Structures are given as structure tokens and as C-alpha cells.
Amino acid sequence: MSSDPMELWHELAKERNAKGLDAILADEAVFHSPVVHTPQRGKAITQKYLAAAFQVFFNESFRYVRELKGDRDAVLEFEAVLDGVNVNGVDMIKWDETGKITEFMVMLRPLKAVNLIHQKMAAMLAAGGS
């Protein structure tokens, strides 16, 4: 397995490997949801949101279409189709000097997609996330 945080992220996303999230998230990780007002702080809650997202987003249509990468951060643009709705969004990811993800922010468009994701993520999180 690679030591590059983005290579690791792409491997986990491709495999929908929620168990692998534990190894790449920092203990103080913060998740910024497009549908939750406050940041979700801590590794456990960040892992829960990302595991649910693996189930909701990562279907056969999901693909990253662009990646902008700095030394300790990246922006990944993605596209997917969920229930006939075109979803376009970005994952904004930061990591520390050890390569662990410290911040993960998701932004989505259009509004119809935001509403659909809100509904699906709420259902997945209520069901336990995986």
C-alpha cells in the first residue's frame, strides 16, 4: 500500500473499503458535511460519515474527474448519478506531516443533489453507516 495520502484515499474509495479509513484518519480529524451545519470533530465520527458516503456515493457511476494537489492538501472534483440525479461535487482534503487526514470537507451541487444526498446519508447513518 502506498504512503501517499491521495493514493491511499483513491484505493479505499475504489474498493469501498471503510475499514481502511482507520489507518488514514488522524485522531483529531474533522469532517465538514454539505448538509450538517457544524463540523464533526474526531476520528470516529469522521470515519462514520465517510463509511456512509462510501455506500451512498460510490456506485458504478462515481468518478473523480479532476485533482488539484498541494504538499499537504488536495481538492478532488467528482461526478456521480444517484437515483437519476446528476451529482457534482468536490472533496477538500488536508493531511498532517505523517500523511493522516486531518480535515475532510465535501461540497455538492445542484440543490436537487444536495437534498438527495441529505436524505440518503441520514438513512445510512441511522442504519449504522455500513
Task: Kindly give the residue locations of the regions a language model identified.
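Short acidic-aromatic low-complexity motifs
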Residues: 2-27
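A beta-strand edge to alpha-helix "cap/lid" segment located at domain peripheries
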Residues: 54-130
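Charged/polar, solvent-exposed surface patches and flexible loops
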Residues: 8-11, 23, 48, 52, ...
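A solvent-exposed, acidic/Ser-Thr-rich amphipathic alpha-helical stretch
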Residues: 18-20, 26-71
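Alpha-helix N-cap/loop-to-helix boundary motif
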Residues: 1, 13, 38-42
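Short N-terminal micro-motifs specific to bacterial/archaeal maturation
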Residues: 11-12, 37, 65, 92
